[in-house]
C-alpha cells in the first residue's frame, strides 16, 4: 500500500511468476503487465536480471521507458510511503544513479565471528582488539547494513553498468524497526 500511496511513482508493477500473487496484486491496485519467466524466478536469480527483464519488456511491449525504477522487495514490507518519497527526493537532490535503504548495524563488523563445525570460534575480519573495537560504543565509527526495503535506480545508469550498486549510490537511512 505504501507504493500505491506514494506521489512519486507513476506505476506500481509487480513482477511474479505466480498467478495467485498476480491476481492479489491486481486486486489491490498494482499492475501485472507480464509474468516473470521461470528462469528468473528461482532463489538464485540475480535482482539485476529481474529488473532488466522488466525494463526490456516494458520498452518492447509498451514503449515505456521510465527514468527511475524502484525495487520494493516483499520481504521488507515495513517501508512507508514517506520512506519511498524521501528516497526519491534524495535521488533527485543528489543526482544519484541509485539510492538504497540501510539501517545502522547492530554489531560492529569486527565483532562478527565465525564458528566452525566443531564449534571453534575464530575472527572473521581481524581481532577485535587489533581493530580497536574495545572502545566505548559511542566513540566507534557507525556502520550500516542494507535492509532490503528500497532500491531505487536511474534506469539509464542501470542499463549502462548492469550492476546493482553503481558508482553514484547514496543511502536512505531507515530506523531499525523498519
Positions of predicted regions on the chain:
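N-terminal glycine-rich phosphate-binding loop and ensuing alpha1 helix
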Residues: 1-15
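A short acidic, often aromatic-flanked loop/helix-cap motif at beta-alpha or helix-coil junctions
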Residues: 39-43, 107-108, 177-178
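Non-catalytic positions within long, well-ordered alpha-helices that form the structural scaffold/packing
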Residues: 4-5, 26, 92
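Conserved core of the sugar-phosphate nucleotidyltransferase
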Residues: 49, 53, 65-68, 77-167, ...
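Short beta-strand/turn micro-motifs composed of small residues
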Residues: 16-17, 73, 102
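Short phosphate-binding loop-to-helix
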Residues: 13, 19-70, 78-79, 86, ...
